[in-house]
Amino acid sequence: MSSNDSNDTDKQHTRLDPTGVDDAYIPPEQPETKHHRFKISRDTLRDHFIAAVGEFCGTFMFLWCAYVICNVANHDVALVAAPDGSHPGQLIMIAIGFGFSVMFSIWCFAGVSGGALNPAMSLSLCLARAVSPTRCVVMWVSQIVAGMAAGGAASAMTPGEVLFANSLGLGCSRTRGLFLEMFGTAILCLTVLMTAVEKRETNFMAALPIGISLFIAHVALTAYTGTGVNPARSLGAAVAARYFPHYHWIYWIGTLLGSILAWSVWQLLQILDYTTYVTAEKAASTKEKAQKKGETSSSSAVAEV
């Protein structure tokens, strides 16, 4: 037998079941095919395309549902008696529409592209090194295009005037509107960083607090700014309504400043290494409780004797 034949035989035997049962053939190990959605080192064209599709579909689904609900609330005669959208029923309806829409959209597409659905949120993720700068740009383009598509679709499917565009109300100035948008966006982005980026046992439920934070932002800001906190949402509605007020820039500058503010707070916590101290405090508390429980058990045993 030649040396080549013996080598082939050796290779064949190395792939047999080590237990020797029925000489079962064990196929060679296959390369890992699943990729980390937020791994910066993977910037292949295919990965970017998948992320772009996921962000487009998620953002479109989120904003189309929210736009239509917002249009219904603003056309309802019973809800528009109060000036500038300050009727409680109107506020709650709009807030629920946006909060629940982003919640189920994130749950659907978080496993595809991360489910940012918001350029401001994408910027926070990029600053936190959860996504690469290239991926951030890809997400931005998909989200902005999806926002305009959702606005056009909602406008075409619903009769009457487009009433889901952002505008200042209740005498709110541009400066106040800028800071309201900034802090509203910061709360939303910080919620994302603390519940989705931080490694916790409750990461799978991140969509719930994110939806709640957007709900709260709409209750707080709608009467004053119309609640942008998402440049794709503001631009898509403005294009559909063909209404670009001279202060439209606050829905971009304010939200981007808010995303930077949220990242700054998150980064400060990382510098302080809060997880180490929180873990140590929990361990000390657990140890103290165990000691007290042991002392109680000893006292009970002595009393019985």
Curated annotation (Swiss-Prot):
Native species: Saccharomyces cerevisiae (strain ATCC 204508 / S288c)
Gene Ontology CC entries for this record: endoplasmic reticulum; endoplasmic reticulum membrane; plasma membrane
Keyword line: Cell membrane, Endoplasmic reticulum, Membrane, Repeat, Transmembrane, Transmembrane helix, Transport
Biased composition (Basic and acidic residues): 286-295
Any coiled-coil regions, as ranges: none
InterPro entries the UniProt entry points to: Aquaporin-like, Aquaporin_transptr, MIP, MIP_CS
Entry's localization field: Endoplasmic reticulum membrane; Cell membrane
Pfam families named among the record's database cross-references: MIP (PF00230)
GO annotation terms (biological process): ascospore formation; transmembrane transport; water transport
Composition bias type Polar residues, residue spans: 296-305
Cytoplasmic compartment residues: 1-48, 113-136, 198-203, 270-305
Topology of the protein relative to the lipid bilayer: Multi-pass membrane protein
Motif, NPA 1: chain positions: 118-120
Record bears the keyword Transcription: no
Family: Belongs to the MIP/aquaporin (TC 1.A.8) family.
Function: Water channel required to facilitate the transport of water across membranes. Involved in sporulation, freeze tolerance and osmotolerance. Is non-functional in most laboratory strains.
Entry note about domains: Aquaporins contain two tandem repeats each containing three membrane-spanning domains and a pore-forming loop with the signature motif Asn-Pro-Ala (NPA).
Extracellular side: 70-91, 158-176, 225-248
Region Disordered: start-end pairs: 1-34, 286-305
Transmembrane segments: 49-69, 92-112, 137-157, 177-197, 204-224, 249-269
Protein name: Aquaporin-1
Motif (NPA 2): 230-232
GO molecular function: water channel activity
